[in-house]
Amino acid sequence: MAPYHIRKYQDSDHRSVVNLFCRGTEEHISASFRYMLLLPGTLLILLGVPLTLFLASGSWLLVLLSTLTLLVSLWLLAKYPWEKYTAMCLHSDMADIPRTYLSSHYSCFWVAESRGQMVGIIAVLPVKDPLLQRKQLQLRHLSVSLEHRREGIGRAMVRTALQFAEMQGFSEVVLVTSMLQYAALALYQSMGFQKTGEFFYTFVSRLRNSPMICLKYCLTSALNDLKT
């Protein structure tokens, strides 16, 4: 296991942070594609449409072309929500990380480094609801490079965010993640985050029945247990 350390974001980190964020998001496209591929409705279409065309035309070429068209369409459907999310982030909070996350005592952005390389990112920001801004801190953009998974970096970064939240007087840390982000979801739940609800981010996510999962972590005694 390579040594690593966690520190606050610096201006010189921007390119590496964006690259790590984009690579992490792109990984979910293939997971979404596999998930959609195994849905009963998808299997019915992938089998039914080519079979119908073959029975109607007797052409294997038409069967091949229709199957390829359906698979490409499925890939584009899997890709669209993640590309939309990435573009939204790069044009909003991550367009100016210092202004968004480092201009207030109640927000922060951290990076993890290992042997001079950027291997992880995580950020926290008060929720937008004015009534909850001094109660709930939102955890965002947790990502660990593929080569450094299972080294405890993600857990350490989440713990850093939770400790920051407690020091700043927040009582809850909340986040939203996709049900298709299996490793992240398992990590959060193993650290004590509890599911509070779910919603569909796009029409495509509703179509494929893959909601976003809302999680909450209650601080104070729970954080003391985590430290031990």
Curated annotation (Swiss-Prot):
Example GO biological process: gastrulation with mouth forming second
Reaction catalyzed: L-lysyl-[protein] + acetyl-CoA = N(6)-acetyl-L-lysyl-[protein] + CoA + H(+)
Residues in N-acetyltransferase domain copies: 61-217
Keywords from the UniProt entry: Acyltransferase, Cytoplasm, Membrane, Nucleus, Transferase, Transmembrane, Transmembrane helix
SUPFAM superfamilies with a match to the protein in the record: Acyl-CoA N-acyltransferases (Nat)
GO cellular component terms, A-Z: membrane; nuclear membrane; nucleus; perinuclear region of cytoplasm
Membrane topology annotation: Multi-pass membrane protein
Subcellular location: Nucleus membrane; Cytoplasm, Perinuclear region; Cytoplasm
Transmembrane segments: 36-56, 58-78
Molecular function, one GO term: histone H4 acetyltransferase activity
Enzyme Commission number: 2.3.1.48
Enzyme class, spelled out: transferase
InterPro entries: Acyl_CoA_acyltransferase (IPR016181), GNAT_dom (IPR000182), NAT_camello-type (IPR050769)
Reported function: Has histone acetyltransferase activity in vitro, with specificity for histone H4.
Family: Belongs to the camello family.
UniProt name for this protein: N-acetyltransferase family 8 member 3
Species per Swiss-Prot/TrEMBL record: Rattus norvegicus
Organism lineage string: Eukaryota, Metazoa, Chordata, Craniata, Vertebrata
